[in-house]
Structure formats: C-alpha cells, structure tokens
Amino acid sequence: MGSRAICIQRVAPPCFEASQVKKIKTVGSFLVNTRSKRRRSTGVKCSSIADYIGGDLVKPDIGQWLQDVEEHKAIAIYAPHEGGYEGRYLNRLKMQGYYFLDISARGLGDPETTLLKNYPVCPAHLGKQPIARWYYPPEVDYRLAALPPSAKGLVVWVLEAKVLSKSELQFLALLPSLRPNVRVIAECGNWRKFVWKPLAEIANLAAQE
C-alpha cells in the first residue's frame, strides 16, 4: 500500500498557486482584447462613389481614348492589378472596325524581326533528330494581308511590355509610321485606375526629337 501511494504522488500533476492562475487569466484576456481592437481598427473606408462602383466605370473617357489612339497611334496603358478594365477600351476599338494581334513581350525576341521580317524558329529535338530551322512570315504583314476590306486597321496589343528595353519600346512607337494601318497598345505597367500615355513619351522619343 505504501508503494502505491508513492506512485500516485509522483504521477499527480503539479498544482498552481492562485496568484499564478490569476496572472494567466489576465494575460489571456489582455491578448483577446488587443486582437479585437486590432480587428476593429483595420477596415476599408470608401471615400467616394468611385470606390463603390469603380473608377473605370465612372470616368466617361472613351471619346478621349479613341481620339488619343488616332492621334498618337502608339499608346502605353497602365491598368489596375486585378485586371478586366482594359477590356472596355479594347471592345470599343473593336467596334470601330479594328482587328487585334495579341502578343506577349516575354519571349518575343527582337520586335523588328518578329513583326516585320521572316524570322527563324528552331523546334525542340530529343537528340536523335537533325537540328531543323523553320521560318515564319512576319506577324504584322501576314495579318495585314489577311484583313477584310471593311477593316479599319490592325491593333498590336503587347502584353507585359514593361519587360522591354527602351530601344524596343522606341521601335513599337515608330511601328505605325512604318505601317500606317497599324496601331500599337503596350501594357507598360499597373496603376490604381486605367490610365494611358503616348508610347513615344514613355520611350523618350519626344525628348530626342
């Protein structure tokens, strides 16, 4: 019996004092209160009606958009990160009679060679086939030749143009002068609302002239 009593005393959990228990409770309640205060303080506040509806839908700037595209012919756009805003401006150009060529700046290579010249492409091989080289027609000239007579022109929409160098952006800004029926829209970055600028200004062509 005595040995059993000793084992029970060893297995029994340690006892906390009343002061220690009170401290733990107070600390726990303090943490809960601070968390609730932080949650209440962090909130999204809408300052105007544009925050509820969307700044893109509030601004009636479609007329200015079409006018700038026809005047400058090469535009750099900055769309919000969530995307979807540029579709409204794209559809309005499509309603004007433009056809689109969507290309990505990543993996484009030399824009002048890809868009205006016959450019080579080496297909992947497994080591047993001979190394081949295929040639593709120029992207812009090929699609200009395939446009219907009722088309107003071709819009080259460049995705992720922020990775292009200044010289490549300068070529895109000069492309409408080489092909009069071509308009260039380059996505050069992101902003809180949909804004655009002449691509020649972004590529520093205006300063050089």
Swiss-Prot record:
<dbReference type="InterPro" id="IPR020874">
    <property type="entry name" value="NAD(P)H-quinone_OxRdtase_su_N"/>
</dbReference>
<comment type="subunit">
    <text>Part of the chloroplast NDH complex, composed of a mixture of chloroplast and nucleus encoded subunits. Component of the NDH subcomplex A, at least composed of ndhH, ndhI, ndhJ, ndhK, ndhL, ndhM, ndhN and ndhO.</text>
</comment>
<dbReference type="GO" id="GO:0048038">
    <property type="term" value="F:quinone binding"/>
</dbReference>
<keyword id="KW-0809">Transit peptide</keyword>
<keyword id="KW-0813">Transport</keyword>
<keyword id="KW-0150">Chloroplast</keyword>
<dbReference type="GO" id="GO:0009536">
    <property type="term" value="C:plastid"/>
</dbReference>
<keyword id="KW-0472">Membrane</keyword>
<comment type="similarity">
    <text>Belongs to the NDH complex subunit N family.</text>
</comment>
<dbReference type="GO" id="GO:0009535">
    <property type="term" value="C:chloroplast thylakoid membrane"/>
</dbReference>
<dbReference type="Pfam" id="PF11909">
    <property type="entry name" value="NdhN"/>
</dbReference>
<keyword id="KW-1278">Translocase</keyword>
<dbReference type="GO" id="GO:0010258">
    <property type="term" value="P:NADH dehydrogenase complex (plastoquinone) assembly"/>
</dbReference>
<dbReference type="GO" id="GO:0009507">
    <property type="term" value="C:chloroplast"/>
</dbReference>
<dbReference type="GO" id="GO:0010598">
    <property type="term" value="C:NAD(P)H dehydrogenase complex (plastoquinone)"/>
</dbReference>
<keyword id="KW-0618">Plastoquinone</keyword>
<dbReference type="GO" id="GO:0050832">
    <property type="term" value="P:defense response to fungus"/>
</dbReference>
<dbReference type="GO" id="GO:0016655">
    <property type="term" value="F:oxidoreductase activity, acting on NAD(P)H, quinone or similar compound as acceptor"/>
</dbReference>
<comment type="function">
    <text>NDH shuttles electrons from NAD(P)H:plastoquinone, via FMN and iron-sulfur (Fe-S) centers, to quinones in the photosynthetic chain and possibly in a chloroplast respiratory chain. The immediate electron acceptor for the enzyme in this species is believed to be plastoquinone. Couples the redox reaction to proton translocation, and thus conserves the redox energy in a proton gradient.</text>
</comment>
<keyword id="KW-0520">NAD</keyword>
<keyword id="KW-0874">Quinone</keyword>
<keyword id="KW-0521">NADP</keyword>
<dbReference type="GO" id="GO:0009941">
    <property type="term" value="C:chloroplast envelope"/>
</dbReference>
<feature type="transit peptide" description="Chloroplast">
    <location>
        <begin position="1"/>
        <end position="45"/>
    </location>
</feature>
<protein>
    <recommendedName>
        <fullName>NAD(P)H-quinone oxidoreductase subunit N, chloroplastic</fullName>
        <ecNumber>7.1.1.-</ecNumber>
    </recommendedName>
</protein>
<keyword id="KW-0793">Thylakoid</keyword>
<keyword id="KW-0934">Plastid</keyword>
